[in-house]
A protein has these predicted regions:
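PLP-dependent aminotransferase class I/II
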Residues: 25, 37-41, 46, 50-52, ...
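Histidine-centered beta-alpha loop that forms part of the nucleotide-sugar donor binding/catalytic region
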Residues: 8, 15, 69-70, 93, ...
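PLP-dependent aminotransferase-like
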Residues: 1-68, 75
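Short beta-strand-to-turn element immediately C-terminal to the catalytic PLP-Schiff-base lysine
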Residues: 90-91, 105-111
Length: 301
């Protein structure tokens, strides 16, 4: 939506079936003279394969924007996601790994130009270089300081305080999320019907959620991914289908796009999403493992 609101046209690349992320190979097929930037979404906390994407962006002189909304604490080759591209966006919505009491977000960048623009944009378009001398003057005079159109998307001090406290807890939370996800994976890894995402050694997964893909060739007659979700929920365990797989099918985009992306479509059909947040107790994780394993066994040939 943010791309469309600027009057630009988002172009959708297919994703890798294992990571659910876009790849340099799929991006390059879509680059034209009108392409301005690449948006990499580290979906579910799984980092994108960034080195090939950065090389591609340099070759075509494109900006790289990292969407880290679900990836607080994720790492790529020892670097935090969000520190690799030109600019990154973070979400502190109430469901995210970090939250600021309901809503909020953050932009990070190592570009002074982008930083200056972002600070002005979220504060009515003020040029702070012009504002600073005015505040220091013994006899302040009125000065025109709004160089551009802006907003009032300012974070409150209370929200920032909550975020700073949560930052100190992030490492411990990340460890708990990984532990919870790995316990679920161990409970079902021997089942042919369950395909567990491969996490390469150079990646640190943030585990915003725990994804499992259903291998449809092992499904019993009369079973589907949706029936599996229903049965897991019926056992008192939260289970979802995951992020929107084919966003171009949303009504807001459907008229403009006549495409079907193979892997995105397959993931929309096959994915299960389970909760692994750090406040879950050992008893609750045990309940999740039991319910998921029980239902997958029932659904298996």
């Amino acid at each position: 939506s943010c791309v469309s609101l600027l009057g630009a046209k988002p172009v959708f690349a297919d994703v890798d079936y294992n990571s659910q992320n876009i790849t340099a190979q799929n991006i390059e097929k879509l680059i034209t003279k009108r392409t301005k930037a690449i948006i990499c979404v580290h979906l579910g906390g799984m980092p994108c394969e960034m080195d090939p994407i950065i090389r591609l962006a340099k070759r075509y002189n494109l900006f790289v924007i990292e969407d880290c909304a679900q990836a607080h604490g994720a790492m790529y080759k020892g670097k935090s996601v969000g520190s690799i591209g030109h600019v990154s966006t973070w979400s502190f919505c109430n469901d995210k790994i970090m939250t600021l009491g309901g809503e909020g977000g953050m932009i990070t960048t190592n570009s002074k130009r982008i930083d200056s623009f972002a600070r002005a944009f979220n504060n009515h378009g003020k040029n702070f270089k012009k504002l600073s001398p005015q505040l220091k003057s013994k006899i302040p005079k009125f000065k025109y300081i709004h160089d551009d159109i802006g907003t009032n998307y300012r974070m409150t001090e209370m929200q920032a305080s909550i975020g700073r406290i949560q930052l100190k807890k992030l490492q411990k939370w990340s460890q708990a999320r990984a532990k919870n996800a790995n316990e679920i994976y161990k409970a079902i890894e021997h089942l042919p019907i369950a395909r567990i995402p491969i996490i390469e050694d150079h990646l640190k997964h943030a585990f915003y959620k725990c994804y499992v893909m259903i291998d449809k060739k092992y499904l019993q007659v009369g079973w589907s991914r949706d029936k599996i979700i229903y049965e897991i929920n019926a056992r008192g365990v939260s289970c979802f289908s995951g992020s929107c797989p084919e966003i171009y099918l949303e009504k807001s985009f459907k008229k403009s796009y006549k495409i079907s992306l193979k892997n995105a479509k397959a993931l929309g059909r096959d994915s299960l999403m389970l909760t692994v947040h750090p406040t879950l107790t050992n008893k609750e994780i045990a309940k999740i493992k039991t319910a998921v394993k029980e239902v997958l066994l029932l659904a298996s040939k």
